[in-house]
């Protein structure tokens, strides 16, 4: 589970790295400054949390409760959808690497820039994924950890988050050197592989929690 968390935060926290660069370089910011997009995630957290908790509660009352390991796997899939959307969009637009794009004439850059709705869709998927993974994952670790190791396991969760953040520098390297769709495709693959690993452990993890 901690390994999954590393790759989730490595992908999710690109919102402060390559996704912010994408907002600066490839999105028309004439109406909205790139830094404003940092507020979209907190906004979605506030709006979507009650809705998602209501859905979980509804399923539980119907006897169809989704286990926490399955929720984490679903969260990785949803995060993958965000990068799938970006990869397909960037491929359809024919975006080159960021370094190549910034070398184009200004008029050509402006004509190719995306509308702000692209970021809205991306952050929506990433925020939903965060709500499936971040609070539920920490709760799961606290639940399955031996009482004598509870503090250690919670610390390992935070260490996994920190390690994911330490890997963030890889995103800008790909963003600047590769066609943009390839950059997003790497994060898509990371999310889908993590989902597959989690699904492979689901039954075992569900037995552990019973």
Where are these regions (language model features)?
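Membrane-embedded alpha-helical bundles of multi-pass transporters/translocases
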Residues: 1-22, 27, 34-136, 140-204
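Short, charged juxtamembrane terminal tails flanking transmembrane helices
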Residues: 206-210
């Amino acid at each position: 589970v901690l390994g999954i968390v590393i790759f989730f935060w490595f992908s999710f926290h690109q919102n402060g790295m390559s996704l912010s660069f994408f907002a600066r370089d490839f999105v028309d910011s004439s109406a909205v400054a790139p830094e404003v997009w940092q507020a979209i995630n907190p906004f979605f957290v506030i709006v979507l949390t009650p809705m998602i908790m209501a859905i979980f509660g509804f399923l539980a009352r119907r006897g169809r409760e989704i286990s926490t390991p399955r929720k984490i796997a679903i969260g990785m899939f949803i995060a993958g959808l965000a990068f799938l959307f970006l990869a397909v969009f960037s491929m359809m637009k024919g975006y080159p690497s960021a370094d190549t794009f910034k070398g184009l004439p200004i008029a050509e850059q402006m004509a190719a820039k995306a509308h702000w709705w692209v970021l809205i869709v991306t952050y929506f998927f990433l925020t939903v994924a965060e709500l499936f993974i971040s609070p539920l994952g920490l709760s799961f670790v606290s639940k399955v950890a031996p009482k004598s190791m509870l503090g250690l396991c919670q610390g390992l969760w935070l260490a996994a988050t920190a390690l994911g953040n330490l890997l963030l520098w890889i995103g800008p390297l790909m963003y600047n050197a590769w066609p943009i769709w390839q950059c997003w495709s790497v994060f898509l693959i990371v999310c889908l592989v993590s989902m597959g690993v989690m699904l492979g452990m689901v039954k075992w993890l569900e037995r552990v929690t019973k």
